[in-house]
């Protein structure tokens, strides 16, 4: 496992992901959601998992609107159960809707890697075998997938 992720490790990727997802703007949200609307959302685990990607998810929301506030229920490396709240965000509704897909994608991908790795480690426990990382990572994601 690497040391804690630093913003320089992930902010360029978060910005690129948002630019790719939003493109020239979130036309649906702008058309349907009043600009003065505020909301709260909860990210919930669909399966048991090892949490990963919290900082990236929060960065996605903050990049869209700095007024978004959050509460972390499960931190990176902690176990989350089926139906358990992982994090909560509140702020301008437009910002939450614009960033939510990017935030979810980061958590789903990184928690998936962490959860599968934990299963491998559990399977070889007591055998003397050791699970090692690889250089074969998704381009641009090396620091994240090895974290």
Outline where the language-model segments fall:
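Acidic/glycine-rich phosphate/pyrophosphate-binding loops and surrounding catalytic core
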Residues: 1-147
């Amino acid at each position: 496992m690497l040391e804690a992720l630093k913003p320089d490790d992930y902010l360029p990727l978060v910005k690129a992901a948002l630019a790719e997802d939003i493109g020239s703007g979130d036309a649906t949200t702008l058309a349907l959601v009043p600009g003065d609307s505020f909301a709260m959302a909860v990210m919930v685990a669909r399966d048991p998992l090892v949490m990963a990607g919290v900082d990236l998810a929060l960065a996605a929301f903050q990049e869209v609107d700095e007024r978004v506030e959050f509460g972390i229920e499960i931190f990176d490396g902690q176990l989350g159960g089926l139906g358990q709240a992982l994090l909560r965000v509140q702020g301008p509704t437009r910002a939450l809707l614009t960033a939510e897909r990017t935030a979810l994608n980061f958590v789903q991908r990184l928690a998936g890697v962490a959860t599968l790795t934990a299963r491998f480690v559990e399977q070889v426990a007591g055998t003397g075998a050791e699970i090692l990382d690889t250089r074969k990572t998704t381009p641009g994601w090396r620091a994240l997938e090895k974290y």
